[in-house]
């Protein structure tokens, strides 16, 4: 009687389906990593709160390069601008080891949050160290309104931007309400001039709280 040939053990039965490997298995996009490697570049991610969300810190001088890479790179072209805002970190005190230590005493810090459909990642870019940045309006149409709000509220000047008019404030106003140096007490009174059919700012006495 000939010995029987041993059968191989299969861990997957015929009815069980094998898990397909994701098509795009990237962490932080390598195109951005190599592009900004020589700059003051840092990034963080969270594996507990949102594992597919990265936070990247760049100098403001790299804003034009960032816009060109996001618009021309193959895996980064299919993206959406989720939100854009700014922060005034003048005199900000942060704990050592926190990623905000890179933004300390940099004045205005811009924040752009993008979602990349092919990578299935969300990356928030913090641009620090300058009040003149390149606009991303040419690649993301919704950046027009977002950057106009940032410009009038924080006094940020955008380069290569077609429309920089104020949205909420009067045209030609020189103050920025969201800056820390903006006075918290009233120093002017806004009245409507019925003869000129426009608003006017009248100086009044300072009020101490």
From Swiss-Prot:
Keywords: Electron transport, Membrane, Mitochondrion, Mitochondrion inner membrane, NAD, Oxidoreductase, Respiratory chain, Translocase, Transport, Ubiquinone. The keyword Membrane applies. InterPro entries: NADH_quin_OxRdtase_su_C/D-like, NADH_UbQ_OxRdtase_30kDa_su, NADH_UbQ_OxRdtase_CS. GO terms for cellular component: mitochondrial inner membrane. Disulfide bonds: none annotated. Complex I is composed of about 30 different subunits. This is NADH-ubiquinone oxidoreductase subunit 9.
